[in-house]
From Swiss-Prot:
Biological role stated in the UniProt entry: May be involved in the transport of sterols.
UniProt entry keywords in alphabetical sequence: Lipid transport, Lipid-binding, Transport
Annotated tissue distribution: Expressed in flowers.
Protein name: Oxysterol-binding protein-related protein 4C
Amino acid sequence: MKKHVMLVKPFSLEDEKDSENTPPNLIQRILSLFKNVRPGSDLTNFQLPPQMNLARSQLQCYGEIVYSFDGHDLLGECSRRDKPIERMKAMVTWYISTLRPLIFGLAPYNPVIGETHHVSNGHINVLAEQISHHPPVSALHATHEKENVDVLLCQYFTPKFRGAYVDVEVKGKRVVKLLNHKETYEMNQPKLLMTFLPAMGAHWAGKIVIKCPETGLGAELQLLSDSFLSRFTGNNKRAIKGKIFESSSRKQLYEISGHWDRTVTAKNTKTGQLEVIYKASENIAKLKTPIVENLQEVSESESAVVWGEVSEGIVTNNWEKAREAKRDVEEKQRESLRKRKASGQSWIPKHFSVARTGKDWDCVPLQPTVPRAPIVVPL
């Protein structure tokens, strides 16, 4: 039987104009879903109808922030810089590029356990795997063949209903290693907020911290969430402010400011020199849909295969097909769980070694590098 692979275009900057006007029926549907949910409730296992799903898995969303970009290869640039301070600036720039626009009222699929996503873009190879379903924990390993860069994510989120908004805290680790320089950059993930009142919207918020123990440099970035007033003034919408500093003395070296969906600058606090370090229009616009380069090598566990029928139903507005296909995916997962329980087997991830301490998860890739994928971003 031929594999059905359904790949969709990553959400680009220019696509936002199509999602700015939220239809009233979607708002009513969202509010009706939450009418029996108490504030403070954990929404981790909350079931959504296909009409409220993006045509992609959460694994694909994680993968896209690494392999989906237009223009300059910002990840490789982190390693190409000669001086430690320049590498930290490049790391800040790359991190900002991973912030992508969000669509209010729509969420990706919750990946099934064992689901994978494997895509390449030039010298960057990305492999993600769902290492747990309850709770939903995702692992991602990416390697840059040319610049010897290693990226590791082990993330899980806890969405909570707060009455006027949904607060999604992303936990876990995000580590980038510049192996040519023997440097490790540790960083966290901002919160995701979906607000209903006083104004509807979905945005990133909170504090981002980047640390490099080897160079003694650090960075802190504050994402200013959309406030009620900013809806009218436009001043704080997607604003980002922060600094690069020496960790030991807290001496500030650069002041970071701008808007992550537009332009971000870095000001040298000693010389006053200002430079543009990031332009969103040159990096997260005009993103290309990945293509299948080798169908035979596409895994049955690939996100685009697992959710292919569901995504096709959503894209074509065939909601009955999408509902049936989603039920099939979920029933297969339940059946797989029943079989494992009956045989006393526990799930073992294929690509990662996993450790769990209480509520904290950690993972290590089983292979030092990620091979080229059968799915690629076209040049």
